[in-house]
Every structure is written in structure tokens, then in C-alpha cells.
């Protein structure tokens, strides 16, 4: 049985909202960790911070051998698309959150 286009659009909208919420949770989690590590008080450009996060993500995915051994960090192989978005959100959120909480 075929679904009407309106029902498919509704399902897509629900999935997009779920994705937005999941990305927000991921960004908040990474932001909290970054603040605990002291990144909130450091003046650094967002592009430079994003590059550092991408390097860190490669390390945990096994792209670069780390001293402690690489692990997946619980990330799915397709987590690459949201990793950049999360890192960008953390870059702007860490600077804002760090000034307000410190």
C-alpha cells in the first residue's frame, strides 16, 4: 500500500526534528566536556578549533594512531557528517558558555 505524499512529508518533518534534537544533545555533551577541559576561556578562532576537533575525531576513529590506542569512542562510521556540525556548534557554544559560567 502506498503512502500519500502528505504522510511522507509528516514523517520527514518528524525525523528532521529528531535529528536536530540528537545533534543538539551531541553538541551540548561535547561542549560540556570542552568547558571542563578549559576551552571556554581560550581565545581561538572557530576554524582552528574545528580543525583540532576533526583531528581528535580522527584519532578516536583510528585514523591516526594515538599513544593509548585508538578506539571508536562509540561513534558510528557515518557519524562524520554530524561530527563537523557538532564541532562547529561546540566552537561557538564553548566560547559563549565559558564566559557566562566562569
From Swiss-Prot:
Alphabetized UniProt keyword annotations: Conjugation, Plasmid
Chain intervals for the UniProt region annotation (Disordered): 61-102
Top-level taxon: Bacteria
NCBIfam families named in the record: CjTranTraC_Agrob (NF043004), PRK13848.1 (NF010422)
Sequence similarity: To A.tumefaciens Ti plasmid TraC.
Biased composition (Gly residues): 62-72
Gene source species: Sinorhizobium fredii (strain NBRC 101917 / NGR234)
Low complexity: compositionally biased ranges: 73-93
Pfam families: TraC
Record-given protein name: Probable conjugal transfer protein TraC
Amino acid at each position: 500500500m502506498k503512502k500519500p505524499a502528505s504522510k511522507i512529508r509528516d514523517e520527514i518533518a518528524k525525523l528532521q526534528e529528531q535529528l536536530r534534537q540528537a545533534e543538539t544533545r551531541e553538541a551540548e555533551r561535547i561542549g560540556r566536556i570542552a568547558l571542563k577541559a578549559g576551552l571556554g576561556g581560550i581565545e581561538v578562532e572557530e576554524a582552528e578549533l574545528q580543525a583540532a576537533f576533526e583531528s581528535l575525531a580522527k584519532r578516536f576513529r583510528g585514523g591516526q594512531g594515538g599513544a593509548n590506542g585508538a578506539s571508536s569512542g562509540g561513534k558510528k562510521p557515518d557519524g562524520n557528517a554530524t561530527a563537523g556540525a557538532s564541532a562547529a556548534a561546540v566552537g561557538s557554544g564553548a566560547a559563549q558558555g565559558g564566559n557566562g559560567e566562569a
